Amino acid sequence: MHEQLHEGADGREIPFEFERKFFVANLPQAAREHGSQQIIVQAYVFAQGGYAIRVRLSFRGMGEIEFPKFAEAVDFLGAYERKILTQLLSRSETADSASVQATIAVKSPSVNGERYELEHEMDLDVAVQILQRSGNLVLKSRYSLWVSEDGWEFDVFAGQNEGLIVAECERLSPVVDLQIPDFAVTEVTADARFTNDSLAKEPWNQWDTQFRQELAARGPFFLDLRSA
């Protein structure tokens, strides 16, 4: 997450993020082989109308982890994600290269890929306790790398969102004049269903078939955002 500070009406600097989001069918091999990887577990203590407060744990240096299959009969209400969280915390204590970071973020709704986002580190134990008590969690592996001149992040979701891959292009200013890469199937920047706070409550496994039918009917779509 890259924050850019903009000056508000009262002269104070306000943090914003600029990103565009795309549905991806398959994780590019370059991302798996050359991207930096982290595993993310997060929950939303508030999410309504596009506004959200998020608590996140980011695990780095864990290596490639193959998550077990999600079983809806027993893994509902965050049981799967909390189980994986416990395993990640245990593994992070024994892996020499592992590190864990806890953060809390406040977000506004996104308009054309621009939104307010303020993120700070928080106490690890407090973050763990919040996540362990949360029913709606998001679990994903994130691969970050440069594609041409842009930084990209590929989120490969697990648990109740298993099968979903989303790519995000972030800049320090509005993402305009973007050369759409081949891996981008269609743009979902303006589709609220693909926000993580929405995926925590209405996961991919509840509407993936509907989305694929919509995509087949209308075809790919990309925002035409150009510099002035």
Regions found by a protein language model. Name each.
Residues 2-228:
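Phosphate-end processing signature that detects enzymes handling 5′-triphosphorylated RNA
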